[in-house]
Amino acid sequence: MFDHLKLLRCFSFTASRDWLFKQSFSNAGLRSVITDLSNGNPLASTTTSMHCWIPKSPNRSKPNLLLLHGFGANAMWQYGEHLRAFTGRFNVYVPDLLFFGLSSTSEPNRSESFQAQCLMRLMEAHGVHRMSIVGISYGGFVGYSLAAQFPEKVEKIVLCCAGVCLEEKDMEDGLFKVPNLEEATKILIPQTPEKLKELIRFSFVKPIKGVPSFFLWDFIDVMCVEFVEEKRDLIKSILKDRRLSDLPRIKQKSLIIWGEEDQIFPLELGYRLKRHIGENAEIVVIKKAGHAVNLEKSKEFLKHLKSFLIDSL
């Protein structure tokens, strides 16, 4: 029987790619830091630490930009192509959310509200008290919560394919391609090549085909095997008892970006979010793009980010 793990120990494409991203982030003027959010108290009953790429030499005359990732690979993979477009104009911060990359907590709270509170503590620990935010998918949930809880701290926000306005009943009403939440967690946190292939099909309009199982196993072993149950709890927490009527309306100027053919969070959720926020929000729908619009239509995605975040500076 073929032992993929033995081969992975000899060479890992995913680990090599991850190393290249680290070099790229470092060359862009960022450094990797893990921050203890337990206030250094050895007697604290819980511990929380967050990893973040932060500026090596922050310029306090520049505005601050917080880039929040979604499920899948770590933050570097999701923003690697766009980073250099912003480091010249912003102090850029790219954290790993809790249970991704090098961030974790012993707290039982799995809500995006708690993620947002930890992020605010992280940013304040680095002397950042006002910022703009880009949130992709799950990162958009956390970013929205940040904007709602700390309105005076957030200037602008970009929400990319973030189904913030979904409701628990949407699953029962058949809005999503998957039949139930359990199946959704198996796809979003793939543990087999078959489930990873499903995730790719759901994420891209034109998914790459014929990827050898070796590469799929490699990605899973490097990116998807840690904190599996905790990540599943994050997904379940999003949907549990969720009602649009309970969602606060944020006041910040907002840009909503959506892939027209998103199969994970259908476009209807983008329009629902626009109606919920109201006149402070504009929506951009990118054609021939799915949920991974930041990767599938990278140049168009970046064009809209720059127009919204930079042109008004």
Would you name each region that the model predicts?
Residues 1-65, 88-90, 310-313:
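Alpha/beta-hydrolase fold catalytic core
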Residues 2, 168-176, 187-251:
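Conserved alpha/beta-hydrolase catalytic His-Asp/Glu region
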Residues 54-102:
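Conserved HGGG/HGGXW glycine-rich cap/lid loop of the alpha/beta-hydrolase fold
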Residues 57-59, 84, 93-135, 303:
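Active-site loop/oxyanion-hole signature of alpha/beta-hydrolase fold enzymes
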Residues 144, 148-149, 153-191:
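Flexible "cap/lid" loop of the alpha/beta hydrolase fold
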Residues 250, 256-258, 262:
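Short beta-strand/loop motif that positions the catalytic acidic residue
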Residues 252, 266-274:
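Short alpha-helix in the alpha/beta-hydrolase fold that links the catalytic acid
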Residues 279-313:
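Catalytic active-site module of serine/aspartate enzymes centered on a nucleophile-bearing elbow/loop
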